[in-house]
């Protein structure tokens, strides 16, 4: 066999191995829930990015987003890191959330926000 023929066969074998490995790797990612696999598939890391695991009630992105924005606004007013985290603790069922609610939201909307906390909470 000539040197050129051997080289071309080695290149062909290498290509087959690379293609086989890449398709096997891609198939293994299809069922994977790792963050890397999610990024490769072009999906977000989590459908429930704002989800607090302490919230055992109904998962409603809109309600959770509204409650979370209240905590963000409260943090922006007071600029203390503990405000943002404590406001969200126990699925918004805490005294910091109530204080933020009283400070930022008109009184006629308090019951609505408290109902949202009950819906997403325990």
From Swiss-Prot:
Gene Ontology molecular-function annotations: neuropeptide hormone activity
Cystine crosslinks: 55-91, 71-87, 74-100
Family of this protein: Belongs to the arthropod CHH/MIH/GIH/VIH hormone family.
Physiological role: Hormone found in the sinus gland of isopods and decapods which controls the blood sugar level. Has a secretagogue action over the amylase released from the midgut gland. May act as a stress hormone and may be involved in the control of molting and reproduction.
Top-level taxon of origin: Eukaryota
Signal peptide: 1-26
An annotated GO cellular component: extracellular region
Protein name: Crustacean hyperglycemic hormones 5
Residues with Valine amide modification: 120
InterPro entries assigned to the protein according to its UniProt record, in alphabetical order: Crust_neurhormone_CS (IPR018251), Crust_neurohorm (IPR031098), Crust_neurohorm_sf (IPR035957), Hyperglycemic (IPR001166), Hyperglycemic1 (IPR000346)
Localization terms from the record: Secreted
Keywords: Amidation, Carbohydrate metabolism, Cleavage on pair of basic residues, Disulfide bond, Glucose metabolism, Hormone, Neuropeptide, Secreted, Signal
Record GO biological process: circadian rhythm; glucose metabolic process; neuropeptide signaling pathway
PANTHER family membership: ION TRANSPORT PEPTIDE, ISOFORM C
């Amino acid at each position: 066999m000539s040197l050129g023929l051997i080289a071309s066969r080695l290149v062909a074998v290498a290509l087959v191995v690379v293609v086989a490995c890449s398709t096997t790797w891609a198939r293994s990612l299809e069922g994977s829930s790792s963050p890397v696999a999610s990024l490769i598939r072009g999906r977000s890391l989590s459908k429930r990015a704002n989800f607090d695991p302490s919230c055992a009630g109904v998962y409603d992105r809109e309600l959770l987003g509204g409650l979370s924005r209240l905590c963000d606004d409260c943090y922006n007013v007071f600029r203390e890191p503990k405000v943002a985290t404590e406001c969200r603790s126990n699925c918004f069922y805490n005294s910091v959330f109530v204080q933020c609610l009283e400070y930022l939201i008109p009184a006629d909307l308090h019951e609505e926000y408290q109902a949202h906390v009950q819906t997403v909470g325990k």
